[in-house]
Swiss-Prot record:
4-CDP-2-C-methyl-D-erythritol 2-phosphate binds at residues 8-10, 34-35, 56-58, 61-65, 100-106, 132-135, 139, 142. Belongs to the IspF family. A divalent metal cation binds at D8, H10, H42. It comes from Pelobacter propionicus (strain DSM 2379 / NBRC 103807 / OttBd1). This is 2-C-methyl-D-erythritol 2,4-cyclodiphosphate synthase. Its EC number is 4.6.1.12. Keywords: Isoprene biosynthesis, Lyase, Metal-binding.
Length: 158
């Protein structure tokens, strides 16, 4: 068994879609980034890569590589899942937290969990996603950005 932790943050800007957990969330702003800037999936990918001892998403998907411009983070997470499988690991469980003042994430969490479980070839009961605010404090509390943390337990198959 191996444990990994991931964290990601992106700035909120006008003129971008807000994608979280592979779900397009209707909102006046979106996250700025080289890919679709899905902080939840990026944190999860980082956690899995950490558990595998494989660095981070910047190593695997550099923001200097035009191949990842506008990339769908579900595809990036799928690549990480395939790497885990190739190394003989599967998801034991995942616990993630989105930190955002607005918009409310709760209505979208079931769809996020389904997307994540599907891409990781797991079941929804092994994927937990929750959301919180920072009560108006810090950059997320002021609505300047959104961040996410993820912790994974990866289980060796052999």
């Amino acid at each position: 068994m191996r444990i990994g932790h991931g964290y990601d943050v992106h700035k909120l800007v006008e003129g971008r879609k807000l994608i979280m957990g592979g779900v397009d969330i209707p909102w006046e702003k979106g996250l700025l980034g080289h890919s679709d800037a899905d902080v939840l999936l990026h944190a999860i990918a980082d956690a899995i890569l950490g558990a595998l001892g494989e660095g981070d998403i910047g190593k695997h998907f550099p923001d200097t590589d035009p191949a990842y411009k506008g990339a769908d983070s579900l595809k990036l997470l799928e690549h990480v899942a395939n790497l885990a499988i190739a190394k003989g690991y599967c998801l034991g469980n995942l616990d993630a937290t989105i930190i955002a003042q607005r918009p409310k994430m709760a209505p979208h969490i079931p769809a996020m969990r389904e997307n994540i479980a599907r891409v990781l070839r797991s079941t929804v009961d092994r994927v937990n996603v929750k959301a919180t605010t920072e009560e108006g404090l810090s950059f997320t509390g002021r609505g300047e950005g959104i961040s996410a943390h993820a912790v994974v337990l990866m289980i060796g198959k052999g």
